[in-house]
From Swiss-Prot:
Glycans are attached at residue 24. Disulfide bonds join 20-66, 32-80, 37-114, 43-92, 47-94, 97-104. GO terms for biological process: G protein-coupled receptor signaling pathway. PROSITE patterns: GLYCO_HORMONE_BETA_2. CDD domains: GHB_like. Belongs to the glycoprotein hormones subunit beta family. This is Gonadotropin subunit beta-1. Involved in gametogenesis and steroidogenesis. Pfam families: Cys_knot. Heterodimer of an alpha and a beta chain.
Amino acid sequence: MQLVLMAAVLALAEVGCFGCHLKNVSIPMERCGQRVCIHTTICEGLCFSEDAVFESPDEAPEHRVCNGDWSYEVKHIQGCPESITYPVATNCYCSACNTKDTYCTRLYAHIPSC
């Protein structure tokens, strides 16, 4: 029974508290002297990645990171000629880290548990 439970937990780990997923966030901004709150979605979470004990210069392990598909929306503020264009994540997924647009290195930090 414990083996079945552990297998189920591991299978669900990708969608658990650390899995790559959409998250609603609010970002305070100021335009034309008015303070507005932008409500959008971002991608957050961790993806499975191997971190070898021995680092070979010939073969680096593939680092997987939480990426997403994005679109942009525009918020118009009444009485203000300036609008706010902001990104909105529409889908999140784990993919190989691309060094052209992402800082791909080890994470030396304490990761709290759920």
